[in-house]
UniProtKB/Swiss-Prot annotation:
This is Uroporphyrinogen decarboxylase. Its EC number is 4.1.1.37. GO terms for biological process: protoporphyrinogen IX biosynthetic process from glutamate. Pathway: Porphyrin-containing compound metabolism; protoporphyrin-IX biosynthesis; coproporphyrinogen-III from 5-aminolevulinate: step 4/4. It comes from Helicobacter hepaticus (strain ATCC 51449 / 3B1). One of its GO terms (molecular function) is uroporphyrinogen decarboxylase activity. The keyword Signal does not apply. It catalyses: uroporphyrinogen III + 4 H(+) = coproporphyrinogen III + 4 CO2. It is found in: Cytoplasm. The record marks 71 as: Transition state stabilizer. NCBIfam families: hemE (TIGR01464). One of its GO terms (cellular component) is cytosol. Its main location: cytoplasm.
Amino acid sequence: MIFIDACFRKPTPYTPIWLMRQAGRYLSEYKQTRTKAGSFLSLCKNVELATEVTLQPVEILDVDAAILFSDILVVPLEMGLPLEFLAGEGPKFNRTISNVSDVVNLQEGAHKRLTYVYDTLSSIRSKLPKEKALIGFCGSPWTLATYMIEGQGSKTYAKSKAMLYKEPYILKTLLETLSEELKLYLEGQIRAGANAVQIFDSWASALECEVYFEFSWKYMKDIAQYIKGKYPHIPVMLFPKGIAGYLDKIDGCFDVFGVDWGTPMALAKSYLGTKYVLQGNLEPSRLYDKESMERGIDEILKIMGKEKGHIFNLGHGMLPDLPRENAIALVQMVREKSKR
C-alpha cells in the first residue's frame, strides 16, 4: 500500500493523498445515504451504510486511503453518557462530568460495546481495493474530556479549564480512564482490519504550552506507545490542531504528525521533518477556487519536495459546500505534480 509505505518513509511513486472528512456533505451520495440512515448517529451504527459512505470518496476521488466513518464521541457514549446530535448545534451530552463520582460511575469496557465500529471496519476492509489503506481513529483523551465536561462544543472551555486548575485530580482521573479505553478501542480497530490509526486532538489549542503537554500530549503519547509496542507494523498518526508554537517540544513514539493549516509547513518541517512523516496541510477553503487550490498544492509540494516523508492532506476537514469537482481535481493534481 502506497499510503503505508509513505508512513514508514519507504519510496513511493508519488505523494499519497487522503482528506480529513472526505466522506461528507460535499458529496450528494453521502447526503442520500445519510437521509436513508435517518440520523447521524444511526449512520455511524449502521454497518452497511457506514461502509457505503466510507467507500464513496475512495471510488469518487481515488484517494489512497479510506478513513472509517464514525465519530470520536461514540466512546463516551458507550461509557454511559447519553449523546444526541442536534441540527445546527452539533453533538450534545445530556449528562456531564463534574466530580470524581461522575468519573467513577462511567461504565467500564466501552471498547467491548463498540462492536458496530469493528464490524464496519471488517466490512470496509473486505470491500476496499487491496492497494488502498484503511484508517481507524479516535479522539484524544483531552478533546473527549472537554465534550464530557462541557456537554457540547465550547469556545472558552470554561468548565474544563476550571476543573484543570482548581481540581486537576478529577480531570487526570478522567483522562487516565479515557486513555485506557482508547488503547483497547484502537487495538480493536486494528484487529478488525485498520491498517493505520489516527488520534485527533481537535481542541489542543485550548491549552497553554506546559499545560498542554501535561494534560493532553502525555496521554496521546501513552496511547501511541501502547499501540506501537504491540503493533509496530501499524502507523500511528497524531493530529493536534493549533499548536504551531509548541513544535519544539513534540516527542514520542509515533510515525506521522498531522499539520493543521494554521501551521506553516516549512516550520513543521524544520522542527519535525527528520523525526516524523508530515501530513497536510492545504487550507480547505482553497478548494472553493481551482487556481487558489493549485497554488496551495504547489507551495506545499515545493516545501516538502518529492522526497520521502510527506502525505498530502488538508489542514482540517472538508467543508460541506466545497465543489466536488475540485476535490477530484485536487487528488489528480497532487498525484501528477508529485510523481517521482
